[in-house]
Swiss-Prot record:
GO terms for biological process: NAD catabolic process; NADH metabolic process; NADP catabolic process. A motif (Nudix box) lies at residues 175-196. NCBIfam families: PRK00241.1. It comes from Pseudomonas aeruginosa (strain UCBPP-PA14). Divalent metal cations. Mg(2+) or Mn(2+). This is NAD-capped RNA hydrolase NudC. Its cofactor is Mg(2+); Mn(2+); Zn(2+). One of its GO terms (molecular function) is zinc ion binding. Substrate binds at R84, E127, Y140, Q208, N209, W210, P211, F212, P213, H214, S215, A257. The gene is nudC. Transmembrane segments: none annotated. Residues 141-265 form the Nudix hydrolase domain. Belongs to the Nudix hydrolase family. NudC subfamily. GO terms for cellular component: cytosol.
Length: 278
């Protein structure tokens, strides 16, 4: 079928022979002139500081595994590339595969031992879970729900920048959902905390996996109600109202932050609405 993804997440068993493998460490992937996927049996014969191996899915019908390495060792003719590089450039199906593999690799690294009794954890075949054989504790891959919101005021949008951003880039507001609150409550609270304004008329737009390292971004538009911008100390370097015809440098095209902005621009101008990547 036209447009069908070449990547499908899954759990091919590590007991079977063959397939492709990704080498991962600290949100970086090993690559050579042929790419990121290596013949599995060949790469496993190299002297690698292996922590864990997990099946992660299928690429063009072939099983794919991830090797989580203890450190990013150097191998002749190969180099390590950061995950963010693949978000910004190149094949989106490939980025989805790498994002999933990175999250599984990090989960495997962080859950080698039981947090309750210290026993070495064991991966299970029937589902994606690490289980302690001593006390029975289960650990599933971590997923952190986060709201991300574009605050609007007619032909103006409220954008902010964190000290961690690329210089000059402004984006939407975002924050993690706390225990006991709904995503909608999180939107109102985070906007108030980060920039000191009140919002209403929330509209859910869509969601996007964000593997940096394990967020699920839940995107909203919200209308400004009241208040003056007061940036949160240590979190927000600057925040401003920007006219739609005079926007600052914006986030990457593939991000949900950029989609929220582009969607609002399209709606105000009557243009065709963009499709959220992923």
């Amino acid at each position: 079928m036209a447009g069908e993804s070449r990547w499908q997440a899954g759990r091919p068993t590590t007991a079977q022979v063959g397939g492709w493998v990704l080498a991962h460490c600290q949100q970086r992937f090993l690559q050579d002139d042929n790419g990121l996927l290596f013949p599995r049996e060949w790469l496993k014969r190299q002297e690698l500081p292996l922590l864990a191996e997990h099946g992660v899915g299928h690429w063009q019908g072939e099983p794919v595994y991830v090797l989580e390495l203890d450190e990013p060792i150097e191998l002749p003719g190969m180099a390590w590339a950061p995950l963010r590089q693949f978000m910004l450039h190149g094949d989106f199906d490939q980025f989805c595969m790498l994002g999933y593999a990175s999250q599984i690799g990090i989960w495997a690294r962080h859950n080698r031992f039981c947090g309750n009794c210290g026993t070495r954890m064991q991966a299970q075949d029937h589902e994606r879970v690490m289980q302690c054989p001593q006390c029975g504790l289960h650990q599933y891959p971590r997923l952190s729900p986060s709201m991300i919101v574009l605050v609007t005021r007619g032909d103006e949008v409220l954008l902010a920048r964190s000290p961690r951003f690329v210089p000059g880039v402004y984006s939407t507001l975002a924050g993690f959902v706390e225990a006991g609150e709904s995503v909608e409550q999180c939107v109102v609270r985070e906007v108030r905390e980060e920039v000191g304004v009140e919002v209403a008329n929330l509209e859910y737009i869509g969601s996007q996996n964000w593997p940096f390292p394990h967020s699920l971004m839940l995107g909203f538009h919200a209308e400004y109600v009241s208040g003056e911008i007061v940036p949160q100390e240590d979190e927000i370097e600057d925040a401003q109202w920007f006219s739609l015809d005079a926007l600052p440098p914006l986030p990457a095209q593939r991000s949900i932050a950029r989609h929220l902005i582009d969607l609002y621009l399209a709606r105000r101008s009557g243009a065709a609405e963009p499709v959220l990547p992923g």
